[in-house]
Regions:
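Non-heme Fe(II)/2-oxoglutarate
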Residues: 1-69
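Catalytic core of non-heme Fe(II) oxygenases with the double-stranded beta-helix
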Residues: 71-137, 141-152
Length: 152
């Protein structure tokens, strides 16, 4: 199940500034861009992102209540900066229950088997981790925070 939440009321300038300070590396799913996936501290654990982490936690909790899922915890989080021309390869998130994507900036749709989501700044997308998803070629820079969850 895929749910979209509009968090565009958040001021993301501080979040974006902090993300751009964090050291990144290449990522096998990101052909043109950078990531913190498996590189350094989980991005949602940075003290500067505590407010955002707490807001996302509340939406994960609402999702769990709606779909009768036991309480969850974050098990990892990272961000990707994808440049124009990047394609996110089809994949799913193993060993996770619910995954999420929070868009700082976005361009190309996030595509699932039966639907797609058009991203915008401040969009939070929560989905079952076993759903395969990908993007077509990005038309502009995309900055996204992604995360996985597991049972408490």
């Amino acid at each position: 199940v895929i749910e979209e939440y509009d968090l565009s009321f958040l001021n993301l300038n501080t979040t974006k500034s902090k993300l751009l300070e964090i050291e990144t590396a290449s990522h096998g799913l990101v052909s043109k861009g950078f990531s913190t996936y498996n590189h350094g501290m989980p991005v949602l654990m940075y003290p500067e992102l505590t407010g955002l982490r707490n807001i996302i936690k509340q939406y994960v909790k609402l999702y769990c209540i709606k779909y009768n899922i036991p309480p969850l915890k974050f098990i990892n989080s990272w961000f990707n900066i994808s440049q124009a021309g990047n394609k996110l390869k089809a994949h799913k998130h193993e060993e996770s229950v619910i995954s999420g994507a929070f868009y700082i900036s976005g361009s190309t749709s996030l595509i699932f088997p039966e639907t797609s989501v058009k991203p915008y700044s401040g969009l939070l997308v929560l989905f079952s981790s076993d759903l395969v998803h990908y993007t077509e070629e990005e038309t502009e820079e995309r900055i996204i925070i992604s995360f996985n969850t597991d049972y408490l």
